[in-house]
UniProtKB/Swiss-Prot annotation:
Gene: purH
UniProt pathway: Purine metabolism; IMP biosynthesis via de novo pathway; 5-formamido-1-(5-phospho-D-ribosyl)imidazole-4-carboxamide from 5-amino-1-(5-phospho-D-ribosyl)imidazole-4-carboxamide (10-formyl THF route): step 1/1; Purine metabolism; IMP biosynthesis via de novo pathway; IMP from 5-formamido-1-(5-phospho-D-ribosyl)imidazole-4-carboxamide: step 1/1
Similarity remark: Belongs to the PurH family.
Protein name, entry field: Bifunctional purine biosynthesis protein PurH
Gene Ontology biological process terms, A to Z: 'de novo' IMP biosynthetic process
């Protein structure tokens, strides 16, 4: 072959194809199209059987190798007459000569997909059945063909079959196209290997005592969107999603509006989690990953939104709204009067959606309920921090387990507000103080480097509404001053984790103020 045959745009005609697939989707149509184009097909096992049953000419791999399938099909294609035809680099005359001397024909196309290992594991199958679904020959063929992409095109997804037939009809794939297919092929086998390695470590070689965090951590993501920029215009950014994950914000359907930005996604994620921290109908309004307002309602989602917005209308301008239930017409009408970047909900009444889409710039998303549990990843210089996701499932998150430190036991309405404020704390960046009344935040102090400033900020935001309200702190009061800031503004009951060396002083300050003070024994820092 001449040097010109290996240029990026040079096509390599397809005369011989090796096909071995577990997923038979589109197989017959592919084989028929290849045959009509004069391509010789070599195939294995059940793949060859399906092709032959349709009257399409096919050479079984055992005829090619002169060696039968053995060991229940574990050994089919692991043979020099197969892999030499895949790995011969035809840019090298000595490789072409070796094939000719051995009487081996090269393959120009490999079509392979792998045993359903992940699906088998997810089905709850036993260890032996899962092990049997670890593909050996398939990945070997895929990797061989992908390595030898100057000479071979490899396809691992039935969605690519139309492209194969188009290439066959028009002289083959270009070198640039074969490179792209090779990259996809190695990504495919990498995903497969990650799944097998993860399962093997957790199932066949677990640590003792058991741990949530394996010694080896492997994951893969797919880029699903290029974003306009990152947190700031000079930063490039993109969105990646985990194809095997529970559908979340990354898989949300956008029904209306401009493209989502990096900051839209971070705020929407915070809002979505915050709204589902509550069993009652809830609306969360978030900006810069902190709540402008969160509220629950036994009346309606519109009532919850109104109360959340009233917490801090100034900050809610340009915020992100999340509801944990269907958005009603009444709520949509209110939202349409406010500049809002994003609204996200599990559903919308048709008329509500029509109202929202009149606003050109609002982004309207529908998403599945967020999955609870799991882990969170945070890159640091030279490594990665992994932790269990902070959920409201600690012993101290149940008010039945709270300790009354001082004051009279809270009446049901006051206790409900304390529980609400405590649950909101999880969604607030530390140091966090939440003041609430009537199932709504009325003052939120967040992101302060000392707790007394967080208390002052919450009181300032709440204004006159603070008197008679309740408050929650995401961590203990290290000194009485933070609590005294709240009681001085008229807060009647407070809940905090406790655990400070000055707990007695804090409790004494609460007793002197005549308020109710509960200890949870749990903490909800967020950084």
């Amino acid at each position: 072959m001449s040097t010109d045959d290996w240029r990026e745009n040079a096509k390599r005609p397809i005369r011989r194809a090796l096909i071995s697939v577990y997923d038979k989707t589109g197989l017959v149509e592919l084989a028929q199209g290849l045959t009509e184009a004069g391509v010789e097909i070599v195939s294995t096992g059940s793949t060859a059987k399906v092709i032959a049953e349709k009257g399409i000419p096919v050479t079984r791999v055992e005829v090619l190798t002169g060696f039968p399938e053995v060991l229940d099909g574990r050994v089919k294609t692991l043979h020099p007459r197969v892999h030499a035809g895949l790995l011969a680099d035809l840019r090298k005359p000595e490789h072409a000569a070796a094939l000719e001397q051995l009487g081996i024909a090269a393959f120009e196309l490999v079509v392979v997909n792998l045993y359903p290992f992940t699906e088998t594991v997810d089905s709850g199958a036993g260890i032996d059945e899962c092990v049997e679904q670890i593909d050996i020959g398939g990945p070997s063929m895929v990797r061989a063909a992908a390595k030898n992409h100057p000479s071979v095109a490899v396809v691992v997804d039935p969605l690519g079959y139309d492209g194969v037939l188009a290439a066959v009809r028009h002289g083959g794939f270009t070198l640039a196209e074969r490179k792209r297919l090779a990259a996809l092929a190695f990504q495919h086998t990498a995903d497969y290997d990650i799944a097998v390695a993860t399962w093997m470590e957790s199932t066949l070689a677990p640590e003792h005592p058991p741990t949530t965090f394996p010694k080896w951590l492997g994951r893969s993501w797919r880029r699903s969107a290029m974003l306009r920029y990152g947190e700031n215009p000079h930063q490039q950014a993109s969105l990646y999603s985990d194809p095997g994950a529970w559908p979340g914000l990354a898989q949300a359907e956008q029904l209306h509006g401009k493209e989502m930005s990096y900051n839209n996604f971070t705020d929407a994620d915070a809002a979505w989690r915050a709204a589902f921290d509550h069993e009652q109908t809830c609306v969360a309004i978030i900006k810069h990953a902190n709540p402008c307002g969160i509220a629950i309602s036994s009346i309606s989602v519109a009532d919850a939104h109104r109360k959340a917005h009233e917490c801090d209308p100034l900050s809610a301008f340009g915020g992100v709204i999340a509801a944990n239930t269907e958005v009603s017409v009444e709520m949509a009408e209110y939202v349409s009067t406010i500049f809002t970047e994003v609204i996200i909900a599990p559903a919308y009444q048709p008329a509500a959606l029509e109202i929202l889409t009149r606003k050109k710039n609002i982004r309207v998303l529908v998403a599945s309920e967020p999955l609870t549990g799991g882990t969170e990843l945070r890159p640091i210089s030279g490594g990665l921090l992994v932790q269990q996701r902070d959920e409201l499932d600690a012993h101290g998150d149940n008010p039945a387990n709270w300790t009354l430190a001082t004051g009279a036991p809270a009446d049901p309405a006051t206790l409900a507000d304390l529980v609400f404020a405590w649950r909101v704390c999880r969604a607030v960046k530390s140091n966090a103080i939440v003041i609430a009344a009537g199932g709504a935040t009325i003052g939120v102090g967040m992101g302060q480097v000392n707790r007394v400033d967080a208390a002052r900020l919450a009181v300032e935001r709440g204004g006159d509404r603070v008197r008679g309200a309740v408050a929650a702190s995401d961590a203990f009061f290290p000194f009485p001053d933070g609590l005294e800031t709240l009681t001085g503004a008229g807060v009647k009951a407070v809940v905090h984790p406790g655990g400070s060396v000055r707990d007695d002083e804090v409790t004494a300050a609460a007793a002197n103020a005549g308020i109710t003070l509960y200890l949870t024994g749990a903490r909800h820092f967020a950084h």
